């Protein structure tokens, strides 16, 4: 493991590691570094960690756990990058006409996290966030922007800063069965299928079905798998319903020679004729394994580049409905005051 170095609070260590695993995934998973080593203890909980390979710094994080085995000299620790703090902290917020970048900076500011590269703001956001994680709150802001421009956003940590990146960018990697793929697998499932969305609207406390968006072919072939969504003003409800449809889920795994460019959220090229995996695929998760003098990657592929989304309750509408009911009750009380007790109001009105 000559090419591999780990810095603990700035101090360099090498040639003591028996196994190092560097991993990550799309959809809000912080990148993780797991290390096994021999010799004296080199870490404490909370220590700053930098991991480099071939003098390229790949991971910045903090030690969350360390351990040792009494019968051997083997010690171990694992660390997460800074994005873990977005998952580990919940907030009570109420945003009104705020830009996504303002929401991002507010959450990161409270967590003492730096903000790195972010896209240009195209929308404003109004929503309450009660007992929601920092990740969910930021994700919801960029989901609102996604509904307008259809770009797919991911929240990642790069060099200790929180970046908002466009998911699916192609990286210069080609995996082939002839050169660098050891094993591969492919499967299909309808476990999470959604082939019809019912769009409804609540008006005067009555529900009204407005539209149905369907995948007719999947309905005919597999039966009905239905979900509902509430109509929203000023958004393309049909397009959003189409986004919710889920067809046959395809998944694939590749075990290949290591390459640091293979990371979750990026697309890579694959030519593997035995499983039919030929083309460009999004990396859903990646696990890089360094052991002895070997370096391999275990990759899960995604067949659709879709935005991670979280459902927030629309408290605004609930409040409006409560106010309407309160006004009606108040008006009724005032009319009742005009009539003495025991009078027949209907008869009097005639």
Q: PLM features: what roles do these ranges have?
A:
Residues 18-32, 234-250:
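Short, basic/aromatic beta-hairpin or loop at an interaction surface
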Residues 40, 74-90, 293-313:
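Short solvent-exposed strand/turn elements
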Residues 66-71, 285-293:
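Short, conserved beta-turn/loop elements at beta-strand boundaries and strand-helix junctions
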Residues 1-89, 178-183:
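Assembly/oligomerization scaffold segments
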Residues 139, 152-244, 251-291, 303-309, ...:
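Acidic, small/polar-enriched beta strand-loop surface segments
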Residues 73-186, 345-350:
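Charged- and aromatic-enriched interaction segments used to assemble
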Residues 17, 30-32, 58, 72-74, ...:
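Extracytoplasmic
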Residues 1-8, 37-68, 98-110, 257-280, ...:
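Short, acidic/charged, Gly/Pro-enriched secondary-structure junctions
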């Amino acid at each position: 493991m000559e090419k591999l170095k780990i810095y603990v609070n700035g101090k360099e260590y090498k040639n003591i590691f028996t196994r190092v695993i560097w991993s990550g995934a799309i959809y809000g998973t912080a990148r993780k570094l797991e290390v096994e080593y021999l010799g004296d203890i080199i870490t404490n909980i909370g220590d700053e960690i930098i991991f480099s390979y071939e003098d390229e710094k790949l991971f910045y994080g903090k030690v969350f756990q360390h351990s040792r085995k009494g019968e051997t000299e083997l010690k171990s620790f694992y660390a997460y990058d800074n994005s873990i703090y977005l998952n580990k902290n919940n907030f009570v917020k109420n945003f009104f006409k705020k830009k996504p970048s303002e929401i991002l900076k507010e959450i990161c500011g409270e967590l003492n996290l730096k903000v790195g590269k972010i896209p240009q703001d195209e929308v404003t956001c109004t929503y309450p966030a009660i007992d929601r994680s920092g990740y969910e709150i930021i994700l919801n802001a960029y989901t609102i922007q996604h509904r307008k421009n259809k770009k797919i956003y991911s929240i990642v940590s790069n060099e200790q800063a929180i970046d908002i990146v466009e998911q699916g960018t192609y990286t210069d990697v080609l995996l082939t069965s002839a050169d660098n793929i050891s094993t591969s697998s492919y499967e299909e499932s309808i476990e999470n299928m959604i082939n019809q969305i019912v769009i409804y609207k609540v008006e005067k406390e009555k529900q009204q079905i407005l539209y149905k968006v369907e995948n007719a072919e999947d309905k005919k072939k597999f039966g009905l798998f239905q979900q509902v969504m509430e109509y929203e003003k000023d958004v393309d409800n049909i397009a959003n319903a189409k986004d919710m449809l889920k067809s046959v889920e395809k998944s694939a795994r590749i075990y290949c020679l290591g390459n640091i460019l293979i990371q979750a959220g990026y697309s890579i090229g694959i030519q593997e004729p035995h499983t039919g995996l030929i083309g460009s695929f999004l990396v859903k998760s990646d696990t890089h394994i360094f052991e002895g003098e070997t370096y391999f990657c275990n990759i899960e592929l995604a067949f659709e580049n879709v935005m991670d989304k979280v459902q927030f309750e629309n408290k605004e509408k609930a409040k409006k409905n409560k106010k309407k009911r309160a006004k009606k009750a108040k008006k009724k009380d005032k009319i009742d005051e005009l009539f003495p007790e025991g009078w027949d109001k209907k008869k009097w009105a005639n």
